[in-house]
Design a protein with these regions (language model features):
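Membrane-interface helix-loop junctions in multi-pass transporters/channels
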Residues: 1-127
Length: 127
């Protein structure tokens, strides 16, 4: 099937939609299981999603075993819906200033550390 065929043009959208449905559902499930008072669910999904996306991208680069469709479904679809910047921003503004700083620092620090850890895992060793 060539790239001009209507199905070939719709396929990426369907792959993203399927991944997005799964990612958003998983995000809701994680957030629903963690205690309130602090946005633990958003922090957890952002850190886990950063780790998973790091694994996906570094593994794809190192092994070249993941197809473009797999990267699109898992990266753009599932993990982009699993992690959430907008919820992070809204929840942060609802916190008192000291806790808002903790939340911002924790989200960014854990996100970067998760990507670094994923990179180390794909290379076969932790730093």
């Amino acid at each position: 099937m060539n790239e001009d065929h209507p199905i070939a043009r719709v396929e990426p959208l369907l792959l993203i939609a399927i991944g997005g449905f799964v990612g958003a559902t998983l995000r809701y499930a994680v957030s629903a299981t963690l205690p309130g008072g602090f946005p633990w669910g958003t922090l957890a999904v952002n850190a886990l999603g950063s780790f998973a996306l790091g694994l996906l991208l570094y593994e794809a680069r190192l092994t070249d075993l993941l197809s473009a469709e797999t990267r699109l479904t898992l990266g753009t679809g599932l993990l982009s819906s699993f992690t959430t910047y907008s919820t992070f921003a809204v929840e942060t503004t609802a916190l008192d200033p000291a806790m808002a700083l903790v939340n911002v620092g924790a989200n960014y620090a854990l996100g970067f550390l998760a990507v670094i850890a994923a990179r180390a895992v794909t290379r076969g060793s932790l730093p």
